[in-house]
């Protein structure tokens, strides 16, 4: 971007995630900025002084394919990856190590979910560490570790494949509950109208600074305010909410719809087309 600015070349930038403008920063202000939703649009204006006419809201391009839905029937998909089609499915997206000074949560949650009479898939992040040292994988639980590894010696040197993304689409489409921390998994769950249970309890008493910090961040506050997720602050509450959601998946439907409206802006599967249209406009090819 620096070289482009020096050379007088127009810069079109895109915000790739909901936390980019508040937990990171724009060092160079582009000529035009593409964003997912009006929340990020307002952040670009209030935090960076960008004029509204230089910001284009397009939705979330990554979700375009999700609107077509699964291509493999539920029973066939379950059997393919080793799940029992007769049982419900819970997906756990780990908290990850970087969200705490010491990750004492992920192992605790996995051990708790192992006692469920349900299918449980732990969907690990492709490029973040998750400490579960000493944990023996429960036999009825699947550990899904996505990503093509480029170099085993460098942690995180991997990239999601189309097959990884397709598997996630099917897991989300067919699951009955999503358990997660303050991550984009909350939007994933809402997009498929799946109950969302947020983990905010710990095996021992911790100081506030040692807990999961992102629940207090600006980018996650709209999720908490939406009414589309329950935040468990004790093991008993976690188990109670878990069974409540599995019995009544319709709970908090309106809140999940609000998450989709606020975070995805348009749920029409055409976000990528709007990105292309913006780039063509920047090149002077409007309507091409």
Where are these regions (language model features)?
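Acidic donor-binding loop of glycosyltransferase active sites
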Residues: 157-164, 169-183
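Hydrophobic beta-strand scaffold residues
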Residues: 9-11, 120, 196
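Conserved catalytic-core segment of nucleotide-activated headgroup transferases in glycan assembly
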Residues: 63-158, 232, 264-267, 271
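C-terminal alpha-helical cap of glycosyltransferases
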Residues: 268-288
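Active-site and donor-binding regions of nucleotide-sugar-utilizing enzymes
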Residues: 1-68, 96-99, 128-129, 167, ...
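Catalytic binding pocket for nucleotide-activated donors in carbohydrate/polymer assembly enzymes
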Residues: 28-30, 50-52, 177, 184-266
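Flexible glycine/serine/alanine-rich "lid" or loop that lines and gates the nucleotide-sugar donor pocket
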Residues: 6, 173-174, 191
């Amino acid at each position: 971007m620096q070289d482009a600015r020096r050379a007088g070349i127009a810069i079109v930038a895109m915000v790739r995630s909901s936390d980019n403008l508040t937990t990171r920063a724009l060092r160079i202000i582009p000529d035009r900025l593409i964003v997912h939703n009006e929340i990020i649009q307002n952040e670009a204006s209030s935090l960076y002084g960008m004029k509204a006419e230089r910001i284009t809201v397009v939705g979330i391009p990554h979700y375009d394919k999700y609107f077509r839905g699964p291509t493999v029937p539920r029973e066939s998909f379950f059997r393919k990856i080793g799940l029992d089609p007769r049982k419900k499915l819970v997906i756990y997206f780990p908290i990850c190590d970087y969200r705490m000074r010491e990750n004492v949560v992920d192992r605790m949650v996995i051990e708790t979910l192992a006692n469920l009479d349900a299918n449980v898939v732990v969907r690990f992040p492709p490029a973040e560490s998750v400490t579960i040292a000493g944990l023996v994988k429960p036999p009825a639980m699947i550990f899904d570790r996505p990503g093509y590894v480029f170099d085993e010696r460098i942690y995180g040197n991997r990239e999601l494949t189309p097959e990884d993304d397709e598997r996630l689409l099917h897991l989300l489409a067919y699951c009955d509950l999503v358990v997660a921390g303050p991550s984009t998994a909350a939007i994933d769950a809402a997009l498929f109208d799946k109950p969302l249970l947020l983990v905010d309890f710990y095996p021992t008493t911790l100081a506030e600074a040692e807990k999961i910090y992102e629940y207090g961040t600006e980018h996650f506050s709209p999720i908490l305010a939406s009414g589309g997720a329950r935040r468990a602050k004790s093991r008993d509450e976690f188990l109670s909410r878990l069974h409540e959601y599995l019995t009544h998946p319709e709970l908090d439907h309106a809140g999940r719809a609000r998450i989709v409206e606020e975070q995805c802006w348009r749920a029409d599967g055409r976000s990528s087309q709007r990105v292309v249209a913006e780039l063509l406009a920047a090149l002077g090819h409007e309507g091409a």
